[in-house]
Amino acid sequence: MAFLVEKQLFKALFSFFLLVLLFSDTVLSFRKTIDQKKPCKHFSFYFHDILYDGDNVANATSAAIVSPPGLGNFKFGKFVIFDGPITMDKNYLSKPVARAQGFYFYDMKMDFNSWFSYTLVFNSTEHKGTLNIMGADLMMEPTRDLSVVGGTGDFFMARGIATFVTDLFQGAKYFRVKMDIKLYECY
């Protein structure tokens, strides 16, 4: 009798594990594979930032809402809100293809470093929707990678990398960054 119970228990467990194995194989076979070498979408844009200095109200695209507390020479603690144009070329006066809306703050006392969190808002005939980008901008590095963590509209649930290259830096008043955006998950 015990042998019969063990045999039935073995059959039940074997059947259960076989079903789990078949189900997990079915789920995995429908999973989207990601080719990390080839992005599904690729863009190059320029982000322009003109920091408000008290005299440039009409042209300013960003403003410091928290000034640095004086803990060193690297603007540690400075918090900036921005709404800047994104263009296809280096010209600030070119027609914007999007707006970069968000913030950055300086978060390192021993070197220039900032942390960005912003949304690219597209509202053109070519693209509609948003891309959400965030991450550390190690400003002294020649290139920096930030994460594309989502999007809406044409960029629904997009994920990828935004590579920053400082194209122009004019002190505390103006900078231009080339953004090379590669999306690896597109739906």
Swiss-Prot record:
GO CC annotations on file: apoplast
UniProt key word Secreted: yes
Glycosylated residues (UniProt): N59, N123
Keyword Disulfide bond included in the entry's annotation: yes
Pfam families: Dirigent (PF03018)
Disulfide bonds, paired cysteine numbers: C40-C186
Subunit-level organization: Homodimer.
Family assignment from sequence similarity: Belongs to the plant dirigent protein family.
Function: Dirigent proteins impart stereoselectivity on the phenoxy radical-coupling reaction, yielding optically active lignans from two molecules of coniferyl alcohol in the biosynthesis of lignans, flavonolignans, and alkaloids and thus plays a central role in plant secondary metabolism. Enantiocomplementary dirigent protein that mediates the laccase-catalyzed enantioselective oxidative phenol coupling of (E)-coniferyl alcohol to (-)-pinoresinol.
Protein name per its UniProtKB record: Dirigent protein 6
Organism: Arabidopsis thaliana (Mouse-ear cress)
